[in-house]
């Protein structure tokens, strides 16, 4: 069973950097669980030949899971595959095509991207940067400019120290790098995915979206994120290739209600949710509840991999529990919100809210707003076993409810399997993320996913 693991840094995050590394690495022995990491390469045209990665030394492609190798393996992929191995008893191989800091358009072919109007500004920006970089001497010119900037900084630092002033910030390499790397639209597809054409993959996991939640990078995401699914299915010759979409978590700090309610991360999560809902043979794995330190790289990767494995075992492999019932992998999925006086009753998609509960019986992560569209923290309680009633004394006539809606979401709602509810909102009001000159308007979510 071969699974492709793609995305950015949270998929690239290795076992050695996780919270469980001190327990896991020393006892990792499984000759039937193997992985290969594709070399990080962005190209202007599809690579047709497969370059054997040198990550393991001795020219090896597949690396066997053992203490000396497991530290290099994608952590999410490892814990996912580990659960599949235990349940299915078959060999599992992971092909890691992740690269930290990448955008969704990095993993889609250029011909497909050229058909997406919202990506045109990114192409224009990239082509302009590349032309300027080449005109300025390419790699040699960049090295000379960086050395000059570094020398000027050293002089300024010495002068500041002599004057007792704060030292200036050291220049970074970013402005001097070849644009034909992570900023290259379609570059990752051409350099890392195209060589895999014809691979017989059982499915894929895709963990990406954080870099589309900065500035205006969210603007093409409603087009480029579902394009990844379509592109990968075409690449592997499987129109119904199962793809587990891993929803981004949260990071940084909450600042104000307006900041939280409009944050880019909400846009990304909503696009991920809507892509799942309208795309058959996909699953969406929640992660916002697994971040304990507000880092953009949460250290707990085992539960992410195991939740993804729940989806795969249930939907791809049709596995059942001890009671012969289908495995449950989804948390409560929003369905409807009905206003009754000063309260909003929220219902969920059938079969997702059995055993509905609030963690430690404490309501957290609920917000309501009236016609003024100003949100307030709300109270909530479980009613009728599978619904939740939400209210706020400061909002006499609520018209909208949101849950786990923030750059760093809170949320205590879960089902009886303790699978967290997906972030949701009942309104379709435009969002205006900070540091953005544009607004996001939700498209019709549609149906068709599972």
What spans do the regions from the language model cover?
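Cell-envelope and extracellular/periplasmic
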Residues: 1-450
């Amino acid at each position: 069973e071969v699974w492709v693991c793609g995305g950015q840094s949270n998929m690239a995050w290795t076992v050695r950097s996780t919270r469980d590394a001190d327990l896991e690495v020393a006892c990792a022995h499984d000759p039937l669980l193997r992985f290969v990491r594709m070399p990080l390469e962005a190209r202007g045209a599809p690579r047709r030949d497969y370059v054997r990665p040198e990550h393991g030394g001795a020219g090896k492609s597949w690396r066997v899971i053992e203490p000396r190798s497991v530290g290099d393996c994608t952590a999410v992929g490892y814990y996912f595959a580990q659960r599949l191995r235990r349940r299915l008893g078959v060999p599992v191989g992971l092909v890691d095509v992740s690269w930290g800091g990448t955008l969704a358009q990095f993993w889609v072919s250029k011909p497909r991207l050229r058909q997406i109007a919202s990506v045109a500004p990114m192409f224009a920006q990239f082509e302009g940067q590349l032309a300027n970089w080449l005109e300025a001497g390419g790699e040699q010119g960049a090295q000379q400019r960086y050395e000059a900037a570094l020398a000027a900084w050293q002089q300024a630092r010495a002068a500041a120290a002599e004057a007792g002033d704060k030292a200036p910030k050291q220049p970074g390499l970013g402005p001097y790098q070849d644009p034909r790397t992570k900023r290259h639209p379609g570059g990752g597809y051409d350099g890392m995915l195209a060589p895999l054409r014809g691979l017989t993959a059982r499915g894929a996991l895709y963990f990406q979206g954080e870099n589309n939640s900065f500035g205006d990078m969210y603007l093409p995401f409603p087009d480029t994120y579902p394009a990844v699914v379509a592109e990968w299915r075409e690449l592997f010759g499987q129109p119904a290739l199962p793809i587990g979409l891993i929803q981004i978590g949260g990071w940084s700090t909450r600042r104000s209600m307006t900041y939280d309610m409009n944050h880019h991360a909400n846009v990304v999560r909503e696009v991920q949710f809507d892509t799942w809902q309208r795309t058959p043979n996909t699953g969406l794995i929640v992660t916002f509840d697994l971040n304990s330190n507000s880092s953009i790289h949460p250290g707990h990767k085992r539960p992410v991999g195991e939740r993804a494995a729940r989806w795969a075992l249930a939907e791809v492999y049709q596995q059942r529990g001890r009671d012969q019932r289908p495995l449950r992998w989804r948390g409560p999925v929003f369905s409807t919100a009905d206003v009754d006086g000063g309260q909003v009753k929220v219902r969920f998609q059938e079969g997702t809210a059995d055993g509905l509960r609030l963690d430690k019986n404490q309501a957290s992560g609920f917000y309501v707003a009236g016609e003024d569209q100003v949100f307030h923290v709300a109270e909530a309680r479980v009613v009728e076993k599978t619904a939740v009633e939400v209210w706020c004394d400061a909002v006499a006539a609520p018209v909208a409810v949101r849950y786990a809606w923030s750059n760093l979401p809170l949320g205590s709602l879960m089902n009886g399997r303790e699978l967290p509810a997906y972030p949701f909102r009942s309104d379709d009001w435009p969002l205006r993320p900070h540091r953005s000159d544009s607004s996001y308007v939700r498209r019709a979510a549609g149906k068709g996913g599972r």
